């Protein structure tokens, strides 16, 4: 048997997958390791739904869906949702939670590049939240997301800027001081400057529509979307019409 890896198998970081597999059983614990994701999800969902003109009746792909927090919430909005992830345990948790909640989401274990090879231009909306900084080749993910969306469709990315403030806030602050996420969750070398992400987007048929920052105030313990992309940020793009 040929032992060579497939052309897209390189874009999997098994150490990153192992991090999330280890805590997958607590994905839906509102006070556990994924508490920040639960808290920012209404902001993410609201941004995606508003800028997509609503999600009802739309075919949506959630890339790097993990345990299904965003995927389920989009399905509750009336979307037909597919969730992609390479972690077996997070997907098992996602499937069980969807079953218990009476929510229909199709969860698939494969890379976004593999999915794009089989489902090009099939989705109205593609989301890729907090995933780009966990893969070896984020540009490949951007390209695959662009290939999956229909003409005129929406693609959303979120990630973390790469600078001193982002390291201080997302690594030192979130992991070691406030202990909002487990130590070792983030690697500052994998953070992505907005100019880099926009450069990759410009090489596809996607066009930037809007960019916003996701901000946390430790004094009020509140998250909000607002201008300023020096730490966490979200990008909305659209695919050109034929």
From Swiss-Prot:
Q: Which GO terms describe its molecular function?
A: 2-polyprenyl-6-hydroxyphenol methylase activity; 3-demethylubiquinol 3-O-methyltransferase activity; polyprenyldihydroxybenzoate methyltransferase activity
Of which family is this protein a member?
Belongs to the methyltransferase superfamily. UbiG/COQ3 family.
Instruction: Output the Gene3D superfamilies linked to this UniProt entry.
Output: Vaccinia Virus protein VP39
Its pathway is: Cofactor biosynthesis; ubiquinone biosynthesis
Sorted alphabetically, the keyword list is: Methyltransferase, S-adenosyl-L-methionine, Transferase, Ubiquinone biosynthesis
Xref: NCBIfam families: UbiG
Q: Tell me what reaction this enzyme catalyses.
A: a 3-demethylubiquinol + S-adenosyl-L-methionine = a ubiquinol + S-adenosyl-L-homocysteine + H(+); a 3-(all-trans-polyprenyl)benzene-1,2-diol + S-adenosyl-L-methionine = a 2-methoxy-6-(all-trans-polyprenyl)phenol + S-adenosyl-L-homocysteine + H(+)
Official protein name in the record: Ubiquinone biosynthesis O-methyltransferase
What are the EC numbers?
2.1.1.222, 2.1.1.64
Q: Which GO terms describe its biological process?
A: methylation
One Pfam family it belongs to? Methyltransf_23
- Protein function: O-methyltransferase that catalyzes the 2 O-methylation steps in the ubiquinone biosynthetic pathway.
UniProt binding sites for S-adenosyl-L-methionine: 44, 64, 85, 129
């Amino acid at each position: 048997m040929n032992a060579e890896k497939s052309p897209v198998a390189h874009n999997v970081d098994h150490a990153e997958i192992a991090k999330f597999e280890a805590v997958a059983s607590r994905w839906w614990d509102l006070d556990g390791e994924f508490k920040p994701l639960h808290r920012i999800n209404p902001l993410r969902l609201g941004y995606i739904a508003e800028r997509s003109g609503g999600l009802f009746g739309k075919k949506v792909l959630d890339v790097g869906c993990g345990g299904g927090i965003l995927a389920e919430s989009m399905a509750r909005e009336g979307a037909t949702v597919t969730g992609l992830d390479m972690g077996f345990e997070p997907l098992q948790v996602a499937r069980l939670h969807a079953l218990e909640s009476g929510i229909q989401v199709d969860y698939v274990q494969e890379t976004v590049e593999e999915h794009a090879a089989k489902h090009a231009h099939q989705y109205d909306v593609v989301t890729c939240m907090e995933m780009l900084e966990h893969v070896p080749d984020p540009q490949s993910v951007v390209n695959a997301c662009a290939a999956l969306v229909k003409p005129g469709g929406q693609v959303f990315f979120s990630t973390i800027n790469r600078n001193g403030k982002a390291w201080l806030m997302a690594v030192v602050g979130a992991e070691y001081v406030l202990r909002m996420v487990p130590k070792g969750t983030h690697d500052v070398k994998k953070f992505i400057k907005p100019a880099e992400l926009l450069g990759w987007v410009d090489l596809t048929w996607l066009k930037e529509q809007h960019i916003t920052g996701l901000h946390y105030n430790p004094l009020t313990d509140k998250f909000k979307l607002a201008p300023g992309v020096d730490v966490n940020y979200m990008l909305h793009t659209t695919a050109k019409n034929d």
